C-alpha cells in the first residue's frame, strides 16, 4: 500500500469543523427554521392520556398551557408518585423545551417532575442531563409558566410527565406545553440475518477522508453495524460488543516490517436499551473523531498510512459470508437503523428506492419492529409482588437482570405448609440460592453460580427445585449449572417477591440476607408462566412499591469516564470510584499529581540531589517525567538526559546527503517545553571535534551543519554564540585558530580541532536533532557530543504579586473547570480577612476567601445551591508567614486543605447539576465591592496552569510585582547558623560564617590529613606594608592588630582517626595562654586549657570509649568565663569549671593549628610530646566562634588570606552524612510510593535511567551492595590519593562564570556575555574602529 503524507493539526481542525456542521445539520431540521414551535396546544383531547383523573372536568385533555377549559387542568384521583400525564404527537418530533403550569386558579401545582419519552408508548426513557435522570424544577403557583430549555434535544412521539413533588397545601395539578419541530427519517429494520451492501461503482474505493453517520437502536448486545475491507489488509468495522460500541480500523500494515495498523477504540455503554443512538465517524488521514450521542472521542490510527482502500462494497447490518473466520464468528446486527449516510450518500434512501440489493437471507423492512420484553426498574425501596400457583411440588422461576451493585435481593418466596422459604440473591457478584428448611434436620441449603454479574449486562437466572433436587443455571450455560441432591420437600407458596421483600421493609421478623435490588429485570417467569407486568401495573393481580414498569433507567456512571490519567472506574448504583494505582495521580478522580512540579519545590521540602519524578503542569495533560535535581548550588539545576551524551563519530558516504543524528530524551518535547518555559535560565553543551570537516562554513557560506531545536526549527549558530549570529564561540571571542573564520573547524585543517560551548537561548532548546555535513571527503572525520539539558530556577514557584490595598484586584480570563477544577497557591497576610479569588456565572460561582484569622472558606454553586467548605486552623493564619491552600472540585466531591491541616471533603449529590458554568472574568484579590485581600499571593495554579501574577501586576496600576519576606517562612531551612537572605524570586542561605556548605548550610566541609600535614589560621591578618611589618614585635602583640581577648569561645568539629596520640586542634596566643584538643595514647580525648592564674593547665579527660577507632566523632566545647560545657557524639552534655584561681580571659589569640602545632617559643610539654609525627585522619566542619579555618582553606572566602597549609589538602566529609531537613513520614510524603516500583512503573517517556528515590529497600540486596560499595570506595580513594600526589602541582581551577565587558576580548563577546538572548547579527560592517 502506498504511504501518504501525515495529517497534521489541520486535519484535526478540519474534523472539528466538519463535526460541528454535521451535528447541526442532523439536529436542526432546517437552517432557516428555529425548532421552537408549540407542539401541544393544537392537539385533540384524544392525544392526551393519564394514570387517572378526579373526574371528566379534570381529564388530561384540559392540560394545555394557558387554557381554562374543564377544571382548568389535569388532576389525578390520587396525589402520589405513581401518577403521570402523557401526550401523543401522532408522529416523531424533535423536542427542544418543555413548560409547565398549575391548574388554573387553584392551589394545585407540581413543584418537581420528570420527563419520559418514547417512540411507541412503551419502553420509556427518562430525560438525562449531567449524567443523571433529570428532575425539572416545577411551579411555585398555579398561574406562572416555568419553561426549561433541554440541554440536548430529544426525538420522540410520546412524552410522559411524572410528578415527583407538588404543593403541600393542594394536590397535583398540571398544564403543559412542549416545544420543538417536525422530524422525519427513513428507517430500516434488520432481522439479524439480512445484510445491506453498498457496492462501489468502480469496485474499489480509495479515500483520504471519510464521514459516516447513522442512528441505531437494538435490544441485542452483539452485532456488526457496518463493515468494509480491502485485499491489501485495510478494513473498517463498527460493531456492538457487550452493549458497547467498538470501531476497528486498519489503514494498512506491512507484513515484512514493523508497521502494524490495527486500531480499535471502544466507547459507550448499555447500548442494548432499544433506544436511538447516533454515531458519527469522521476521518482525515490518520485523525479520527468518533462521536456517540454527542460525546466525541478523538484518536489517531496506528501505522504510517493515510488512505483507506476498500474493495467492492461496504455493508451495513453485518458481514457477508466469505469463508473467512471473521465473517462467521461475528453476529449480524438485529434492530433498526435510520439516516445512514456514507460520504454524502444516503444509504437508507437508496434502500427504500430499491437501488441496493440486500442479501438473499433474511428480510429487510422499513418499519421498526419493537421487542416484546417489558422491563421493570427497581430502586433501593422497591419490590414487585406477583402471584404463584399454590401447593405445587415444582418450584420454578426465571428472569433476566442487570445491575451495577454486587449485592442485592432478587427473589424471595415462602413455601406452603410452613416448609421453609427460598431466597435468590446477588452476593459478591454471584447468584446464590438459600433454601431454609424447617421440616428436616438440615436447616439450610446453599448453592451459588456465576461471577462478575454486576457488570451492567443482562444476565439470565433459572432456578428449579423439586423433591430432593435443585438446579441453578446462569446465562443458559447448562454445562456449568449447579445442582444439589440434598433432602428437600417442596410446596410452592402463593406469593413471589422480586427485588425486595415487603416484610423486610416493615421490619418483620422474616429477614433476608441481602438489601433490596437496584437495577432492572425482564422476562420474569413464575411456575413456567410469563408474568404480565401490565396487569401487575394495574394491581390485578399482584402489587408493587416504587417500581417503574416498562422502563429500565440504569445509568453507567463510568461513561463518560471521569477517572483521569487512565484511572480505573468501578461503580455501584448511585456512585463511582476511581482506582488511581500506578497512574502517578491521586484524588477522587485521579486528578492531582503525587509529584512536585519542579526540582525547586523538592529543594524547599529539604530533599537532596537525586533523581526525582516531577510534574511540571500538575493536573494538566503532560504527565510526570524523571529528571535529575542537582541541589548543590543556591539555584537548583534540573537535568533532562538523552541517549547521545557520549561522543559519537559521524560518518557519511554520500556528498549529497547529510548525516542526521536524532536525540531521544527521557521526556516528551511538550514536557521539556514546560520545564524551559518556567525556568529562569537553560543551557545545553554541544561539541564538534573535526578534522577536515567544516561546520558553519563561515564567514559567508551556507552551513554544512546545523541543529534543530524546539518546534522543529533549524538553527545555524553553535555553542557559545547566540541566535542570528552564524558563529562559534571562538568567533565571538575572536580567538579562532584562523582569524579569517568564525569557527575553528571552518579552517578545514588536517589536524583535530574543536568548536564547543553552551547553547543558552532557552526558547530554542532543547537540541532534538543535529544534521552534519562535510564528512564524506577523503580524510574527513567528525565527532559530535551533546550534553543534557540543564535548567535553573522555577519562575512559576516564585511568581507572585503584592496586593497593597483591599480594593485592588487582578483580572484574568474565565476559569475553565466545568467538571474538574483544582486551585492551589501560597498566601501571606497580616489582615484577618479578604477574598483570594472569585469567578461568577449566570448562577454558578466559585470563591476562595479568608473569612477570619483562623478560617479559610471555599464556596461554589454548580446549580444545586451554594456549597461552602471551611477549614479552621488552631493558630492564626494572618501571621505574615507563607500558607498553602489547595482546593478541588469535581463531579464526585469537593475538598479544601490549608497547609498540613486535615483536608475537609464534601461529597457531591448523586443527582443534580455537575457542570460549573462561569462567564465573568476571574478576579484575584477580590472584586464586586467585597472585602479584598491585603497581602501577597504566589504560585497561583489553576488546573495545572500557573497564572502570571507578576506580569499582570506590572501592567495594573497600584500593584507590586513579586513579594518580600520569604525568610520569615523559610529562614529555618538555613541550618548550622546559616543566614537567610531575601531574593526577588525566593531566598538563599548565606553560609559564610559557618563551617558548612550547600544550599541549606548542611553539607560538611572537611579534609583528609596525611602524616606531617598541618593547617594554620592566623587571627591577625598578614601585614600589608613595610610599616606594619616593622612595627610587629614577636611575643609583644600590637593591641590594634591582635585578636581581642576572649571571655568565651565555642569549638565545634568532627574527626576520625586510627592513630594516637595526636593533636587535633591547638589555639596559641601572643601570651602563654593556649587551648588544645588532643587524643591521648589510649585513644581517649583530652582538652587542655591554660588561661593563666594556675601553675598547670586545666585538663578535661573523657572516659568514653576509644576515639581513635576510625569512626567519625563530633566535639562541641563551649566556655563562658569559668564554665565549660562539653558534648561528645550522642552522649549528654557535661559541665566543668575552671579552678577559682584561673583567669577568665583568653588573652590575645594568635593562631589556630589543625593536625600539628608549628609555633615558635615555649610549648607545653604534653603538646610537644604528642605533636610528632602529627595527626593522620579526617577533620570536618571545624569552627572556632565565627571562624571556619578548613572552609577558608578549601573555598575562596574573605578569610582565605589568613590560612597557610603544609601539604596537599584533600577534601572529604569524613564519612559523615550531610545533615538534611527533618524527613517527612511516609504517610505525608507525596513521593513515597511503597506500592510502585520504579523499575516497573509504566510512565510515558521513561527510559529507565536513574532511580526515583525509594524509602524501602531490600535488606539482602542492601548488605551485598554495601560490601561491594566499600570495596569500590577503597579502590577509588587509593587511586585519588595517588593521582593527587603525582599531579599535586598541576591543578587548575575552571569556572563557567560569565565574563563581563571588562574581560571580554571583543564587542561580540561582551554583548553575548551580558545578554545571551541577543539576536542581532554582528558583522564587520557594524564594528567601530579608533583611528
From Swiss-Prot:
The portions of this protein that span the membrane are 1263-1283
Q: Where is the signal peptide, in residue numbers?
A: 1-27
Cytoplasmic side of membrane: 1284-1331
Q: Residues in domain Fibrinogen C-terminal?
A: 592-798
**Which residue range or ranges hold the Laminin G-like domain?**
187-368, 373-552, 799-963, 1023-1214
Q: Which family does it belong to?
A: Belongs to the neurexin family.
Per UniProt, subunit arrangement is: Interacts (via C-terminus) with KCNA2.
User: What protein name does the entry list?
Assistant: Contactin-associated protein-like 2
Which species? Pongo abelii
Amino acid at each position: 500500500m502506498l504511504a501518504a503524507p501525515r495529517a497534521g493539526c489541520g486535519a484535526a481542525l478540519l474534523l472539528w469543523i466538519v463535526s460541528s456542521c454535521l451535528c447541526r445539520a442532523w439536529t436542526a431540521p432546517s437552517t432557516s427554521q428555529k425548532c421552537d414551535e408549540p407542539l401541544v396546544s393544537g392537539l385533540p383531547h384524544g392525544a392526551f392520556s393519564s394514570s387517572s383523573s378526579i373526574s371528566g372536568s379534570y381529564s388530561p385533555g384540559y392540560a394545555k398551557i394557558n387554557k381554562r377549559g374543564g377544571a382548568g387542568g389535569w388532576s389525578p384521583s390520587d396525589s402520589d408518585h405513581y401518577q403521570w400525564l402523557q401526550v401523543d404527537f401522532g408522529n416523531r418530533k424533535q423536542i427542544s423545551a418543555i413548560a409547565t403550569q398549575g391548574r388554573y386558579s387553584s392551589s394545585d401545582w407540581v413543584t418537581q417532575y420528570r420527563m419520559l419519552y418514547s417512540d411507541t408508548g412503551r419502553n420509556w426513557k427518562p430525560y438525562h442531563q449531567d449524567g443523571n435522570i433529570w428532575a425539572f424544577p416545577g411551579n411555585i403557583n398555579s398561574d406562572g409558566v416555568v419553561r426549561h430549555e433541554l440541554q440536548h434535544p430529544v426525538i420522540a412521539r410520546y412524552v410522559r410527565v411524572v410528578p415527583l413533588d407538588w404543593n403541600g397545601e393542594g394536590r397535583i395539578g398540571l398544564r403543559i406545553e412542549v416545544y420543538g419541530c417536525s422530524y422525519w427519517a427513513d428507517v430500516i429494520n434488520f432481522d439479524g440475518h439480512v445484510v445491506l451492501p453498498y457496492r462501489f461503482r468502480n469496485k474499489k474505493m480509495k479515500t483520504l477522508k471519510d464521514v459516516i453517520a447513522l442512528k441505531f437502536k437494538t435490544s441485542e448486545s452483539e452485532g456488526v453495524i457496518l463493515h468494509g475491507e480491502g485485499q491489501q489488509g485495510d478494513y473498517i468495522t463498527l460493531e456492538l460488543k457487550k452493549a458497547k460500541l467498538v470501531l476497528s480500523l486498519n489503514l494498512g500494515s506491512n507484513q515484512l516490517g514493523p508497521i502494524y495498523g490495527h486500531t480499535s477504540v471502544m466507547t459507550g455503554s448499555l447500548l442494548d436499551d432499544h433506544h436511538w443512538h447516533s454515531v458519527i465517524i469522521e476521518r482525515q488521514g490518520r485523525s479520527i473523531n468518533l462521536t456517540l450521542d454527542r460525546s466525541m472521542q478523538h484518536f489517531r490510527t496506528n501505522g504510517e498510512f493515510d488512505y483507506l482502500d476498500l474493495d467492492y462494497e461496504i455493508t451495513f447490518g453485518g458481514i457477508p459470508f466469505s469463508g473467512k473466520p471473521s465473517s462467521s464468528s461475528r453476529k449480524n446486527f438485529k434492530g433498526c437503523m435510520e439516516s445512514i449516510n456514507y460520504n454524502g450518500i444516503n444509504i437508507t434512501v437508496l434502500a427504500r428506492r430499491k437501488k441496493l440489493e440486500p442479501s438473499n437471507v433474511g428480510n429487510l423492512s422499513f418499519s421498526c419492529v419493537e421487542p416484546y420484553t417489558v422491563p421493570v426498574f427497581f430502586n433501593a425501596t422497591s419490590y414487585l409482588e406477583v402471584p404463584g400457583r399454590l401447593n405445587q411440588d415444582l418450584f420454578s422461576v426465571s428472569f433476566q437482570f442487570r445491575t451495577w451493585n454486587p449485592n442485592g435481593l432478587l427473589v424471595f418466596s415462602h413455601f406452603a405448609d410452613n416448609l421453609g422459604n427460598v431466597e435468590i440473591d446477588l452476593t459478591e457478584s454471584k447468584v446464590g440460592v438459600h433454601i431454609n428448611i424447617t421440616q428436616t434436620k438440615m436447616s439450610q441449603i446453599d448453592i451459588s453460580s456465576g461471577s462478575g454479574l454486576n457488570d451492567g449486562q443482562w444476565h439470565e437466572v433459572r432456578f428449579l427445585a423439586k423433591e430432593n433436587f435443585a438446579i441453578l443455571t446462569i446465562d443458559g450455560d447448562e454445562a456449568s449449572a449447579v445442582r444439589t441432591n440434598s433432602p428437600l420437600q417442596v410446596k410452592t407458596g402463593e406469593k413471589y417477591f422480586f427485588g425486595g421483600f415487603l416484610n423486610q421493609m416493615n421490619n418483620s421478623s422474616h429477614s433476608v440476607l441481602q438489601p433490596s435490588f437496584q437495577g432492572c429485570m425482564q422476562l420474569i417467569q413464575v411456575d413456567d408462566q410469563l408474568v404480565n407486568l401490565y396487569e401487575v401495573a394495574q394491581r390485578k393481580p399482584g402489587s408493587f412499591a416504587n417500581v417503574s414498569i416498562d422502563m429500565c433507567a440504569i445509568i453507567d456512571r463510568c461513561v463518560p469516564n471521569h477517572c483521569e490519567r487512565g484511572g480505573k472506574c468501578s461503580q455501584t448504583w448511585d456512585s463511582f470510584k476511581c482506582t488511581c494505582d500506578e497512574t502517578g495521580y491521586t484524588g477522587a478522580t485521579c486528578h492531582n499529581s503525587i509529584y512536585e512540579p519542579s526540582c525547586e519545590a523538592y529543594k524547599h521540602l529539604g530533599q537532596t540531589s537525586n533523581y526525582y519524578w516531577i510534574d511540571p503542569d500538575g493536573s494538566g495533560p503532560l504527565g510526570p517525567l524523571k529528571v535529575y535535581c542537582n541541589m548543590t548550588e543556591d539555584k537548583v539545576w534540573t537535568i533532562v538526559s538523552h541517549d547521545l551524551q557520549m561522543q559519537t563519530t559521524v560518518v557519511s558516504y554520500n556528498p549529497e546527503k547529510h548525516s542526521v543524528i536524532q536525540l531521544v530524551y527521557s521526556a516528551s518535547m511538550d514536557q521539556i517545553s514546560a520545564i524551559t518555559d518556567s525556568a529562569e535560565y537553560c543551557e545545553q553543551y554541544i561539541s564538534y571535534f573535526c578534522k577536515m570537516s567544516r561546520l558553519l562554513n563561515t564567514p559567508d557560506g551556507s552551513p554544512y551543519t546545523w541543529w534543530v531545536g524546539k518546534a522543529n526549527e533549524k538553527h545555524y549558530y553553535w555553542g557559545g554564540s547566540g541566535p542570528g549570529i552564524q558563529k562559534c564561540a571562538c568567533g565571538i571571542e575572536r580567538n579562532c585558530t584562523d582569524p579569517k573564520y568564525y569557527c575553528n573547524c571552518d579552517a578545514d585543517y588536517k589536524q583535530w580541532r574543536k568548536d564547543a560551548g553552551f547553547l543558552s537561548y532557552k526558547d530554542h532548546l532543547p537540541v532534538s536533532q543535529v544534521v552534519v555535513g562535510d564528512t564524506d571527503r577523503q580524510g574527513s572525520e567528525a565527532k559530535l557530543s551533546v550534553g543534557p539539558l540543564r535548567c535553573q530556577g522555577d519562575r512559576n514557584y516564585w511568581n507572585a504579586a503584592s496586593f497593597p490595598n483591599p480594593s485592588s484586584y487582578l483580572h484574568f480570563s474565565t476559569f475553565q473547570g466545568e467538571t474538574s477544577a483544582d486551585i492551589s497557591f501560597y498566601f501571606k497576610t497580616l489582615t484577618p480577612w479578604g477574598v483570594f479569588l472569585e469567578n461568577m456565572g449566570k448562577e454558578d460561582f466559585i470563591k476562595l476567601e479568608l473569612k477570619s484569622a483562623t478560617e479559610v472558606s471555599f464556596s461554589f454553586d454548580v446549580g444545586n445551591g451554594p456549597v461552602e467548605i471551611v477549614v479552621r486552623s488552631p493558630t492564626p493564619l494572618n501571621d505574615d508567614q507563607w500558607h498553602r491552600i489547595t482546593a478541588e472540585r469535581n463531579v464526585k466531591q469537593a475538598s479544601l486543605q490549608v497547609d498540613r491541616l486535615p483536608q475537609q471533603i464534601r461529597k457531591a449529590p448523586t443527582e443534580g447539576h455537575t457542570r460549573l458554568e462561569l462567564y465573568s472574568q476571574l478576579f484575584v484579590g477580590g472584586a464586586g465591592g467585597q472585602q479584598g485581600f491585603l497581602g501577597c499571593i504566589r504560585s497561583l495554579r489553576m488546573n495545572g496552569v500557573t497564572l502570571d501574577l507578576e506580569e499582570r501586576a506590572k501592567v495594573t496600576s497600584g500593584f507590586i510585582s513579586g513579594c518580600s519576606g520569604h525568610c520569615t517562612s523559610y529562614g529555618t531551612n538555613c541550618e548550622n547558623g546559616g543566614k537567610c537572605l531575601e531574593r526577588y524570586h525566593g531566598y538563599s542561605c548565606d553560609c559564610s560564617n559557618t563551617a558548612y556548605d550547600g544550599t541549606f548550610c548542611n553539607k560538611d566541609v572537611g579534609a583528609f590529613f596525611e602524616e606531617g600535614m598541618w593547617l594554620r589560621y592566623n587571627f591577625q591578618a598578614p601585614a600589608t606594608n613595610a610599616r606594619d611589618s616593622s612595627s610587629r614585635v614577636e611575643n609583644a602583640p600590637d593591641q590594634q592588630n591582635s585578636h581581642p581577648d576572649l571571655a568565651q569561645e565555642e569549638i565545634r568539629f568532627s574527626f576520625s582517626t586510627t592513630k594516637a596520640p595526636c593533636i587535633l586542634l591547638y589555639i596559641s596566643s601572643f601570651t602563654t595562654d593556649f587551648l588544645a584538643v588532643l587524643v591521648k595514647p589510649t585513644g581517649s580525648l583530652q582538652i587542655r586549657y591554660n588561661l593563666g592564674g594556675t601553675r598547670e593547665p586545666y585538663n578535661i579527660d573523657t572516659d568514653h570509649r576509644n576515639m581513635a577507632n576510625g569512626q567519625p566523632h563530633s566535639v562541641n566545647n563551649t566556655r563562658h568565663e569559668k564554665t565549660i560545657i562539653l558534648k561528645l557524639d550522642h552522649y549528654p552534655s557535661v559541665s566543668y569549671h575552671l579552678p577559682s584561681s584561673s583567669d577568665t580571659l583568653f588573652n590575645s589569640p594568635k593562631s589556630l593549628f589543625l593536625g600539628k602545632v608549628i609555633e615558635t617559643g615555649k610549648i607545653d610539654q604534653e603538646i610537644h610530646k604528642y605533636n610528632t609525627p602529627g595527626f593522620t585522619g579526617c577533620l570536618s566542619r571545624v569552627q572556632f566562634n565565627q571562624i571556619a579555618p578548613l572552609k577558608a582553606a578549601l573555598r575562596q572566602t574573605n578569610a582565605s588570606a589568613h590560612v597557610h597549609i603544609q601539604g596537599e589538602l584533600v577534601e572529604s566529609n569524613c564519612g559523615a552524612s550531610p545533615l538534611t531537613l527533618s524527613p517527612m513520614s511516609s504517610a505525608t510524603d507525596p513521593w513515597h510510593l511503597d506500592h510502585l516500583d520504579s523499575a516497573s512503573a509504566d510512565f510515558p517517556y521513561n527510559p529507565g535511567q536513574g532511580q526515583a528515590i525509594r524509602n524501602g529497600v531490600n535488606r539482602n540486596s542492601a548488605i551485598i551492595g554495601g560490601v561491594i560499595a566499600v570495596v569500590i570506595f577503597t579502590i577509588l580513594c587509593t587511586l585519588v590519593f595517588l593521582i593527587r600526589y603525582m599531579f599535586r602541582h598541576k591543578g587548575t581551577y575552571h569556572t563557567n562564570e560569565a565574563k563581563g565587558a571588562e574581560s571580554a576580548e571583543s564587542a561580540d563577546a561582551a554583548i553575548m556575555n551580558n545578554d545571551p538572548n541577543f539576536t542581532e547579527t554582528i558583522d564587520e560592517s557594524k564594528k567601530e574602529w579608533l583611528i
